[in-house]
UniProtKB/Swiss-Prot annotation:
Official protein name in the record: Ribulose bisphosphate carboxylase large chain
EC class name: lyase
UniProt lineage: Eukaryota, Viridiplantae, Streptophyta, Embryophyta, Tracheophyta
Cofactor annotation remark: Binds 1 Mg(2+) ion per subunit.
Any Gene Ontology biological process: photorespiration
Modified residues (N6,N6,N6-trimethyllysine): 14
Subcellular location per the Swiss-Prot or TrEMBL entry: Plastid, Chloroplast
Misc note: The basic functional RuBisCO is composed of a large chain homodimer in a 'head-to-tail' conformation. In form I RuBisCO this homodimer is arranged in a barrel-like tetramer with the small subunits forming a tetrameric 'cap' on each end of the 'barrel'.
Listed GO MF terms: magnesium ion binding; monooxygenase activity; ribulose-bisphosphate carboxylase activity
Family as reported in the entry's similarity comment: Belongs to the RuBisCO large chain family. Type I subfamily.
Protein role: RuBisCO catalyzes two reactions: the carboxylation of D-ribulose 1,5-bisphosphate, the primary event in carbon dioxide fixation, as well as the oxidative fragmentation of the pentose substrate in the photorespiration process. Both reactions occur simultaneously and in competition at the same active site.
Cofactor(s) named in the record: Mg(2+)
Enzyme Commission number(s) from the entry: 4.1.1.39
Residues that hold Mg(2+) according to the record: 201, 203-204
Length: 475
């Protein structure tokens, strides 16, 4: 931005335009424990110094505007302004910088992810002085964390509700995602749960379409759940998608699910919005429902390396807004996910305290204090041959979700579920015996398939299936 002269006005302040860095770039600032800290990847326009670009981000996402205004004198800018307190170059990128910005806690409404994002990313991403801007990470202070309920129940309470311990949970997204009648949909749910899965799932775009209205789907799925439970002696669930066009309709669907006695509902938290999601999460805690979260639309926001918002920020926001599960990539399947970076935000979802670790993309130490954890869901292009790697990468506190990897079994849905359950139990047993899943995984699956014809058939069908593309989500 080219410097412009200030003019003296008769109202007693210096009107005009001045460089942002004069007010908002403060390299000597010592951050407070109560500050919200942000790490932005900044790509300035040619000729714009990094300090000016970083200061512009701090200004436009807090108290600043493009010109000096006389009402600045009616408040304490020094108390309320955002500050760009550090800038560092991005390795291997000549035109990109990481700008660290500190925001005073008083800028944000308590318990509102909506307000937090409106302030930090709501306006500044269209700023002309920047070619591109990406929010890489946020540090949420303990004082702000304590204003959020967070997940309705969390990992331990969910395990207690399900009475399932010592292994990942198994799920399946019902396919085809669109076009089935409610009765046929419920039949697929029953067959998968009866075969050994813990959960089945509505696809994210299954809401209430002409071919299958939500109430009919809920009824047939509830029947399938209770029938499978009575026959297996295990607690089962189906993620009934309550996402709707209005909050009132969403809540009506959640209330009906509770009245049916099912254990879990679902929400598309990005397309549905954070206000709706937080509302639903509060209802779920008050009424004993687990809440599964799908991240539909996330790649629109997080896929580009130099612009948008990294998924670790969306994951933190979800933990604050509320959800017991969230999709988090697979590392090994068809959807995006580089191993170290994926495990970085998986830890941010599950653990109470996470140390700064730039090798995994974690820019700040994060203390969640007593906020419950979220189960990461691995889903997308995975099958029985991936089971050893998934078990080793994600550990017990996860949901492994096989859609086509269940329903695509040559013998049908129930045998597909059996194959996945046998593969999982074999991997967990081998791990508990001290075997190396990364090195011996294929052998473990082959040995298990000798006494499970369902697993043997699945192994044969998917033995050549690979999704080998370079990951976009790299440091």
């Amino acid at each position: 931005m080219s410097p412009q002269t200030e003019t003296k006005a008769s109202v007693g302040f210096k009107a005009g335009v001045k460089d942002y860095k004069l007010t908002y770039y403060t390299p000597d600032y010592e951050t407070k424990d109560t500050d919200i800290l942000a790490a932005f990847r900044v790509t300035p326009q040619p000729g714009v110094p990094p300090e000016e670009a970083g200061a512009a981000v701090a200004a436009e996402s807090s108290t600043g505007t493009w010109t000096t205004v006389w009402t600045d004198g009616l408040t304490s800018l020094d108390r309320y302004k955002g500050r760009c307190y550090h800038i560092e170059p991005v390795a291997g990128e000549e035109t990109q910088f990481i700008a660290y910005v500190a925001y005073p806690l008083d800028l944000f409404e308590e318990g509102s992810v909506t307000n937090m994002f409106t302030s930090i990313v709501g306006n500044v991403f269209g700023f002309k002085a920047l070619r591109a801007l990406r929010l890489e990470d946020l540090r949420i202070p303990v004082a702000y964390c304590k204003t959020f309920q967070g997940p309705p129940h969390g990992i331990q309470v969910e395990r207690d509700k399900l009475n399932k311990y010592g292994r990942p949970l198994l799920g399946c997204t019902i396919k085809p995602k669109l076009g089935l009648s409610a009765k046929n949909y419920g039949r697929a749910v029953y067959e998968c749960l009866r075969g050994g899965l813990d959960f089945t799932k509505d696809d994210e775009n299954v809401n209430s379409q002409p071919f299958m209205r939500w109430r009919d789907r809920f009824l047939f799925c509830a029947e399938a759940i209770f029938k499978a439970q009575s026959e297996t002696g295990e607690i089962k669930g189906h993620y009934l998608n309550a996402t709707a066009g209005t909050c009132e309709e969403m809540m009506k669907r959640a209330v009906f699910a509770r009245e049916l006695g099912v254990p879990i509902v679902m929400h598309d938290y990005l397309t549905g919005g954070f206000t709706a999601n937080t509302t639903l999460a509060h209802y779920c805690r008050d009424n004993g429902l687990l809440l599964h979260i799908h991240r539909a639309m996330h790649a629109v926001i997080d896929r580009q390396k130099n612009h948008g918002m990294h998924f670790r920020v969306l994951a933190k926001a979800l933990r604050m807004s509320g959800g017991d599960h969230i999709h988090a990539g697979t590392v090994v399947g068809k959807l995006e996910g580089e191993r170290d970076i994926t495990l970085g935000f998986v830890d941010l979802l599950r653990d109470d305290y996470i140390e700064k670790d730039r090798a995994r993309g974690i820019y700040f130490t994060q203390d969640w204090v007593s906020l419950p954890g979220v189960l990461p869901v691995a889903s997308g292009g995975i099958h029985v041959w991936h089971m050893p790697a998934l078990t080793e990468i994600f550990g017990d506190d996860s949901v492994l979700q096989f859609g086509g990897g269940t329903l695509g079994h040559p013998w049908g849905n129930a045998p597909g579920a059996v194959a996945n359950r046998v593969a999982l139990e074999a991997c967990v047993q081998a791990r508990n015996e001290g075997r190396d899943l990364a090195r011996e995984g294929n052998e473990i699956i082959r040995n298990a398939s000798k006494w499970s014809p369902e697993l043997a058939a699945a192994c044969e069908v998917w033995k050549e299936i690979k999704f080998e593309f370079q990951a976009m989500d790299t440091l």
